[in-house]
Regions:
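Sec-dependent bacterial lipoprotein signal peptides
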Residues: 1-28
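Bacterial Sec signal peptide processing site at the extreme N-terminus
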Residues: 22-45
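N-terminal segment of the mature soluble domain
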Residues: 50-113
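Short acidic, glycine/tyrosine-flanked loop/strand segments centered on an H-E-D-like triad
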Residues: 54-66, 145-172
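Surface-exposed short loop/turn segments
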Residues: 98-152
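Surface-exposed interaction patches
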Residues: 137-141, 152, 157-159, 185-196
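C-terminal/domain-edge helix-coil "capping" segments
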Residues: 167-204
Length: 204
């Protein structure tokens, strides 16, 4: 009986040592993983559009809310800032007359909580905790007095992604920035598609 008791104690000690070793090893492996930094914004990655206008005017009419679920006031750069950078790089006036006006009416970034399942199986799952959403609403107006030409493009672009409950603060920052960049790409796609419909707006 004493022999069986000692054997059981040895087995318990061995299992405990294995558990501690695995935990320490996992911690070492985790700490060695490189940290992903939030992606930067490089407007040079977008192809320029040669606009038949003498100047580009950017009007920021978006008043960012300072309360949840809006978080843009805590970001640098802001969503509005990215739009201005994009426009300054992409919409290049090369004409001798006329004007291109970009009126930004919304450039928001929000984070909202997602409902979680409370069943037993969900306790062992990495549930999605929050949703990041970036939204852009703007109007692009072209006024060319020569030939009495003009055109308007309505921009309505958005992007979103979810963040799991196990995400680190850095993971959260990466998700927010990537969502913002996705919205800029959506906006860029819309502008390129719609400028083709306005004859004479874009020069070769």
């Amino acid at each position: 009986m004493r022999f069986l008791l000692i054997s059981a104690m040895k087995k318990a000690s061995l299992l405990c040592m294995i558990f501690i070793s695995v935990s320490l090893f996992s911690g070492c492996v985790t700490s060695q993983q490189p940290q992903i930094t939030p992606p930067g914004f490089d407007p040079a990655g977008y192809k320029t559009l040669r606009i038949d206008a003498r100047k580009l005017q950017i009007i920021e009419n978006w008043q960012m809310p300072m309360e949840p679920p809006y978080i843009e006031h805590m970001l640098e750069p802001t969503m509005s800032g990215l739009i201005v950078e994009w426009a300054s790089r992409v919409l290049i006036p090369v004409g001798g007359s006329g004007e291109l006006i970009l009126n930004i009416s919304k450039a928001s970034v929000t984070v909202s909580e997602l409902p979680k399942s409370a069943d037993l199986a969900s306790l062992f799952k990495n549930q999605q905790e929050s949703k990041v959403r970036a939204e852009v609403k703007a109007r692009l107006m072209w006024i060319q007095p020569i030939g009495d030409r003009n055109g308007t493009i309505e921009i309505d672009a958005s992007a979103s992604r979810t963040v799991p409950e196990t995400a680190t603060p850095n993971d959260y920052d990466v998700a927010v920035r990537q969502t913002m960049l996705d919205a800029i790409t959506q906006m860029d796609d819309q502008v390129r598609l719609k400028t083709v419909e306005i004859l004479g707006l874009v020069l070769p």
